[in-house]
A protein has these predicted regions:
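Nucleotide-activated sugar donor-binding and catalytic core shared by glycosyltransferases
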Residues: 1-184
Length: 184
């Protein structure tokens, strides 16, 4: 890694289909942020071949077994929805949450579960703390716009994270999250 450039980490998920759907969009934004260096945090249980097709033609390091260090060292992360969104918040790094699946999977999930938010951070806080780019909104233009925004307003996100810590510190975060999901 280049120590003189601020780091932005991509966490494209742990499932092969997530990696294949999300990572190709994420890596395209590198060209819009030449003052930053980018890295992919390789998921546990995955290896280089799981990422090779998605990064073909791009020069981006994939680093395994260092996810928390990468998140801590980053000025921002772009995270596929899941537990990594909460982990990124707990480590204090501003993030954008993204998610892409097949149209049919998304359509079925949307009909079964009517949630206001998909990221654990936003669900627990019951407001948008981190921007969510879902399905067609997970594209180069919106990712670039959102990343520029959080690089500027990272203090607001970090302040909201402090409120999140307070909620989690009180205990019962699992029950609170379940209750909020059931209310939706």
């Amino acid at each position: 890694l280049l120590s003189d450039k601020p780091l932005i980490t991509f966490l494209p998920g742990s499932r092969k289909q997530e990696i294949n759907k999300v990572l190709p969009e994420l890596i395209k934004i590198q060209k819009n942020f030449s003052k930053y260096q980018f890295v992919v945090a390789g998921a546990p249980g995955r290896d280089m071949k799981d990422y090779s097709e998605s990064i073909k033609g791009y020069s981006i390091p994939i680093i395994f077994d260092e996810t928390y260090n990468l998140i801590r060292s980053s000025v921002a992360c772009i995270v596929t929805s899941g537990t990594a969104t909460l982990e990124t918040a707990l480590l204090g790094t501003p993030q954008i949450v993204c998610y892409k699946s097949s149209f049919l999977s998304y359509f079925i999930a949307k009909k079964i579960v009517d949630l206001k938010y998909i990221s654990l951070v936003n669900i627990i806080m019951n407001k948008e703390v981190v921007e969510e780019l879902i399905q067609k909104d997970c594209n180069v233009k919106k990712l670039t716009h959102s990343l520029n925004k959080i690089l500027i307003k990272s203090d607001q996100i970090k302040n909201d994270y402090k409120k999140l810590y307070q909620i989690l510190d009180k205990g019962g975060a699992s029950k609170l999250t379940c209750d909020l999901i059931m209310q939706s």
